[in-house]
């Protein structure tokens, strides 16, 4: 099963994954907004770093759910 197929299945069937995915997208949008600016204030730079950390944490959590899903599929076959 391809990664995108797993992501689509989890987005449809797993509330936790869907929540993480949506939050990750929201953080990505926020980060993009900050990166569009020519210069960042000190506060914006701190916010950018915090967003990057939060985004990475969400991505790690989603990766774990994908790994668990793959494991369940392999065990079922």
Labelled PLM ranges:
Residues 1-77:
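Extended, charge-rich alpha-helical interface modules
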């Amino acid at each position: 099963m391809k990664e995108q197929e797993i992501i689509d299945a989890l987005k449809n069937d797993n509330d936790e994954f869907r929540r993480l995915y949506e939050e990750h997208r929201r953080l990505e949008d926020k980060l993009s907004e900050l990166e569009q600016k020519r210069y960042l204030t000190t506060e914006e730079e701190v916010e950018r770093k915090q967003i990057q950390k939060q985004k990475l944490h969400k991505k790690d959590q989603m990766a774990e759910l994908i790994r668990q899903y793959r494991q369940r599929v392999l065990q079922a076959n």
